[in-house]
Amino acid sequence: MRTIVRRLCNPPVLLGILLVCRLALLILAPHTDPSESRYAEIARKMVETGDWITPQFDYGVPFWAKPPLSMWMSALGIELFGVNEFGSRIFIFVGALGVLALVADAARRELGKEAGWTAAAVLTGMPLFFYCSAAVMTDLALLLGTTLTMVCFRGAMRGGPRWSGYGVFAGLAIGLLAKGPLALVISLPPIAAWLLITGRWRTAWRSLPWFTGTVVMLLLALPWYLAAERKTPGFLDYFLMGEHWNRFTVRGWQGDLYGNAHPVAPGMIWVYLLLGSFPWCLGLLRARPASWRGFRIWAMAHHGRGLYWILWALWPVAFFTPARNIIATYPLPALPALAILLAEFHGTTTPASLPKPVPRPLSPMLAGITLAFAAWAIVVSLFLPELAPKQSERALIRRFERERSPGDRLIYYGPRKYSSEFYTEGGIDHTVSAGTIAERLDSPGRTFVALPSYWLPLIPPPVRRRLLPVASWGPGPSLYVERTDMPDMSGIDPSRTSPIGN
């Protein structure tokens, strides 16, 4: 038993198990509403319509909220592997492997071979990275860009190859195409602060191709911005002012064209960071300096190595501390630096500034919690979906496909469900009007109606009596089919029917 536990705590073994678990979830877990399925459906529409410039929120409705890099990645997978979970997620996962490779290489160069494995295993075991590493969202693409920039800048300052300098600007271009100017705000201030504290401005000026690198960055990112504004005028105003200013400064911002604001108290991002890095953040609890002088020695040693990791880890969180409209994925850019710090504390030598050896992050307890989390994610996603924090319409769509006959149709009543659009490849209708349900029931062919259970009382009784239950999924959606033994409803005005209960 001890041998098994010891092997599971070995960083390469733990990393391999976690990646296999994530790959299994990538293939088997359904797309959930609203975020992941929304981006997956946008990518599917991109392939269907052949419009790779303007992402579409609905057919003919531009999606201005985010640049298209992550949607390009998903659309490429759908183009190659079909409209399924694997196709829409695989290149997001490839991007995550790129992040792990960058983090492992940086830790290996700075701290040794073992530290590279440790940093990669710790990062993969953090719940926030584990989820985002194959989720169809924009966050992983942004992380790839910021990590490339930060790792390559550190490499260039240590006398690395010339491509390291160009990697800084390539990372910024990736970030601009993933989430826009936010990539610059996340990457450049910690670099500037590090240069200011260490005084290595001249080295930075000599080590980086500032002019040609900037040209490369603009050549990679600017053409899409110009093409998007030309194709759908008004994009730049909404994207730059709305998404990059009002979203973070206006509590409960109502200008979001594609969703709802997420009002939170200032400082909530620190809670998200702790939850997103648990349990590995516990490895920092005893990493307290014995004195300010000892901390300075450690932080400035090896060309300011410790200071660089700290600034990289703290800045994304500090920047969003006053923000009133954030979601739980916002601490993600800080996690690679946090993983490298933990890898350093995991080493056999203890930094001189620390009073005593820190607890090794790859302890049986931390590794066990991480593996339990991964196992629970698989069990919930595949066997207990009603316990999942987010729901999917995949089971309902599969049931409809089994029940349907030629000429049958499905209409969704209630909030828009992007996963239903993805799994039917756009082959459903959506309405919030009970009158539309009545019209479809009077049309030729058999009608299936899907709706959340709590929307059923909103359907007038004459309409509801024509629906026969097919299946329901706990507190989630329910599927109904048109009854064939009811009289025709032509001539009934649903708007004039009595409310439920009368």
Predicted regions, residues:
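A detector of low-complexity, intrinsically disordered, Ser/Thr/Gly/Pro/Ala-rich segments
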Residues: 52, 136, 482, 495-498
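Extended hydrophobic-aromatic, low-complexity segments
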Residues: 327-331, 342-343, 348-351, 362-366, ...
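Signature aromatic-anchored transmembrane alpha helix within multi-pass, membrane-resident enzymes
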Residues: 347-379
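Membrane-integral, polyisoprenol-dependent glycosyltransferases
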Residues: 2-354, 421, 459, 475-476
